[in-house]
Amino acid sequence: MSHMLSIEPLTREAFAPFGSVIEADPASMRFINGGNTERFHALARVDAAGEGAGVIINIFRGQPRVFPYSVTMMERHPLGSQSFSPLRDRPWLVVVAEDQGDRPGRPRVFIADGRQGVNYGRNVWHHPLMSVGAVSEFIVVDREGPGNNLEEFHYDEAFVIPDPSSEELR
């Protein structure tokens, strides 16, 4: 049996239980460099726990998913946060779930507009990178160091994401 999921717009308020939305928020803007640069300050905080841990910056290249897509697993990082910021102006999906006793609950799906990134908080259940429509590259900031920083969970039943380009979602 499978369960249909709805796709929600990505907003700071809706995503707050899972981490931070990374976008050019006018409330956080300040001018620097003699007024030549707009700095959008402190949009998210990086978390890297454990002795010998550090923060690394990566580029991930995500292949587009085929929709409808069945979510059958989720992952989380118990020792650090993980952020994804797109390098191209392409929509992408963010799939998260609240923790229910060391297992993910029902997934929630957000569509990011291509100018929005996210920072998953430590221990937040999420699906791996979900590009839509084309190969997409992302700057990924996460933790490196000793210790197991990956837990996976496989659902007994699938949760289905409809095609995000379908007319019903516009």
Swiss-Prot record:
Entry's EC annotation: 4.3.2.3
Catalysis performed (reactions): (S)-ureidoglycolate = urea + glyoxylate
Family annotation (InterPro entries): RmlC_Cupin_sf, UAH_cupin, Ureidogly_lyase, Ureidogly_lyase_bac, Ureidoglycolate_lyase_dom_sf
SUPFAM superfamilies cross-referenced by the UniProt entry: RmlC-like cupins
Similarity-based family: Belongs to the ureidoglycolate lyase family.
Protein name: Ureidoglycolate lyase 1
Record flagged with keyword Lyase: yes
Pathway: Nitrogen metabolism; (S)-allantoin degradation
Pfam families the UniProt entry points to: Ureidogly_lyase
